[in-house]
């Protein structure tokens, strides 16, 4: 069965479903790397991707946003040693789906809404407060516009509205 659209899982109600020791067959999250680049360098700015809505972000949307941000930064900056990109959200919540059959005679084969708990199909990160940090890039001053552009493209991969905030890491010298 194909993957349902992300809008089916964008909003949530009820407590998080995270106890993996009780859930058989939870698929692994697609996002595996959470830090990329050189974290030891001295950077001037941190560009943050913050949420403007409350909801859920599926693991494949997080991975797509991470990949496109990394690809944009490496193509514009040149190499991975001139910035530090990190993802702060982890997809803990297990998403379930009650699969329904849609063909002639399906009503004889399935139970409908009886025992409709569903089977695990993926994981999602829950955003519970406005302004939550999803990911951030630390850059030098000359790469600041590249980081903003990379996050603009990456935000199109996420199901929630986001905003890009620039935070200076060093004090500006006034002379």
UniProtKB/Swiss-Prot annotation:
BP-aspect Gene Ontology terms: translation
The GO cellular component terms are:
ribonucleoprotein complex; ribosome
What are the record keywords, sorted?
Ribonucleoprotein, Ribosomal protein
Q: Which InterPro entries match?
A: Ribosomal_uL16 (IPR047873), Ribosomal_uL16_arc (IPR022981), Ribosomal_uL16_CS_euk_arc (IPR018255), Ribosomal_uL16_dom (IPR016180), Ribosomal_uL16_euk_arch (IPR001197), Ribosomal_uL16_sf (IPR036920)
Q: Name one GO molecular function term.
A: structural constituent of ribosome
Similarity section:
Belongs to the universal ribosomal protein uL16 family.
- Known NCBIfam families for this protein? PRK04199.1-1, PRK04199.1-4
The identity of this protein, by name, is Large ribosomal subunit protein uL16
The species this protein belongs to is Metallosphaera sedula (strain ATCC 51363 / DSM 5348 / JCM 9185 / NBRC 15509 / TH2)
Query: What is the taxonomic lineage of the source species?
Result: Archaea, Thermoproteota, Thermoprotei, Sulfolobales, Sulfolobaceae
Q: Which gene encodes it?
A: rpl10e
